[in-house]
From Swiss-Prot:
Residues 106-128, 145-190 are annotated as: Disordered. SUPFAM superfamilies: Glucocorticoid receptor-like (DNA-binding domain), Nuclear receptor ligand-binding domain. It is found in: Nucleus; Cytoplasm. Keywords: Cytoplasm, DNA-binding, Metal-binding, Nucleus, Receptor, Transcription, Transcription regulation, Zinc, Zinc-finger. This is Vitamin D3 receptor B. The lineage of its organism: Eukaryota, Metazoa, Chordata, Craniata, Vertebrata. Residues 243-261 are annotated as: Interaction with coactivator LXXLL motif. It comes from Danio rerio. Detected in embryo 24 to 48 hours after fertilization, and in intestinal bulb. Zn(2+) 1 binds at residues 23, 26, 40, 43.
Length: 422
């Protein structure tokens, strides 16, 4: 009985691709190189048996039979002669002992591979479900076509150049990794809705649409109306995302609001990394009209004290090359921080955050062999976000104290950022 162990000769891929897969003995479909020649399984077995038995065949005709797939059994002498003519060599045939050793080697490799596979870190069903839920929540609350941006008050890039704007171009030379970003998640919202109403809406109905924003005349901060609408819209989407985090709805309304008020700008900054480009240090949200550079943000009242670390953060986060699963888990961890001002049930919030953190660590172990530092780098990004949040709050307060500017902000922005405690 023929051995099931292959004794085929391995040949380079380039040669394999250029050689027709036809048996050189009988013209049947070849299965590879066997004993130094391209043959079918039938002729491979015939040659092995003939050599092992040291068979001696005699042609009943004139010794020049044409061997084909249909007649290859009619003349063994000419078939064997054809095998030798195309280069098949008995030296390539394994002895019974060699065949047994090869079988054992193949089995040992299979066992080792099975053991490695069994030892590989795996996610539990519960952890996989948490990831799937968060990815789905992100997809439902982040429209990467940015189609709703046209509903905001239009961007106006003309106007007086501020000191920050004149220095903003220098940020385009940044290429190293470090701290944070500016906000611009997907979709628009009712500027008359407050945070409590939005929480109730998402609690009862889930995701909702968002009406058009009114166009108003701008002030010297020409981009403020547009970016105020963008941030208001992004806050609504963060609320929608938060409501789908496993366990978030079970928190008290007070704790939900406290978490959202304190973390909204940080989650927006995290989400905005999806549209951030390392090539020109800008956020591209669709067409040219909705491509934002640092100079645009200075025209909404922010200074380089926020924007420089913001861009460094975006660069650093982008260079981590996070999987989408890691990105959404990081957003959930950010949102579920028990040390936020106003949170009452710290233990419950911390338990939710710990569970998501464990999922992130398990995912990294399963998908980044040797990437032990990745989790620490991601958590450092959350620390960077705290600093950015603090600077954003300081600059927001300065802006909101000026009536001509605060009137450009939406009620939701005023509520979320107006009551922050730092």
């Amino acid at each position: 009985m023929e051995s099931a162990v292959s004794t085929s000769t391995q040949v380079p891929d380039e040669f394999d691709r250029n050689v027709p897969r036809i048996c050189g003995v009988c013209g049947d479909k070849a299965t590879g190189f066997h004993f130094n020649a391209m043959t079918c399984e039938g002729c491979k077995g015939f040659f092995r048996r003939s050599m092992k038995r040291k068979a001696s065949f005699t042609c009943p005709f004139n010794g020049s039979c044409t061997i084909t797939k249909d007649n290859r059994r009619h003349c063994q002498a000419c078939r064997l002669k054809r095998c030798l003519d195309i280069g098949m060599m008995k030296e390539f045939i394994l002895t019974d002992e060699e065949v047994q050793r090869k079988k054992e080697l193949i089995q040992r490799r299979k066992d080792e591979e099975a053991h490695r596979e069994a030892q590989k870190p795996r996610l539990s069903d519960e952890q996989r479900n948490i990831i799937d839920t968060l990815v789905d929540a992100h997809h439902k609350t982040y429209d990467d076509s940015y189609s709703d941006f046209s509903r905001f008050r239009p961007p106006v890039r003309e106007g007086p150049v501020t000191r920050s704007a004149s220095r903003a171009a220098s940020l385009h030379s940044l290429s190293d990794a470090s701290s944070d970003s500016f906000s611009h998640s997907p979709e628009s919202g009712d500027r008359k809705m407050n945070l409590s109403n939005l929480l109730m809406m998402y609690q009862e109905q889930g995701l909702s649409s968002s009406p058009d924003s009114k166009e108003e005349d701008g002030s010297s901060l020409s981009m403020l109306p547009h970016l105020a609408d963008l941030v208001s819209y992004s806050i609504q989407k963060v609320i929608g995302f938060a409501k789908m985090i496993p366990g978030f709805r079970e928190l008290t309304a007070e704790d939900q609001i406290a978490l959202l008020k304190s973390s909204a700008i940080e989650v927006i900054m995290l989400r905005s990394n999806q549209s951030f480009s390392l090539e020109d240090m800008s956020w591209s949200c669709g067409g040219p009209e909705f491509k934002y550079c640092v100079n645009d943000v200075t025209k909404a009242g922010h200074t380089l004290e926020l924007l420089e670390p913001l861009v460094k953060f975006q660069v650093g986060l982008k260079k981590l090359n996070l999987h989408e699963e890691e990105h959404v888990l990081l957003m959930a961890i950010c949102l579920l921080s028990p040390d936020r001002p106003g949170v009452q049930d710290h233990v419950r919030v911390e338990a939710l955050q710990d569970k998501v953190s464990e999922v992130l660590q398990a995912y990294i172990r399963a998908h980044h062999p040797g990437g032990r530092l990745l989790y620490a780098k991601m958590i450092q990004k959350l620390a960077d976000l705290r600093s950015l949040n603090e600077e954003h709050s300081k600059q927001y307060r300065s802006l909101s104290f000026q009536p001509e500017h605060s009137m450009q902000l939406t009620p939701l922005v005023l509520e979320v950022f107006g009551g922050q405690v730092t």
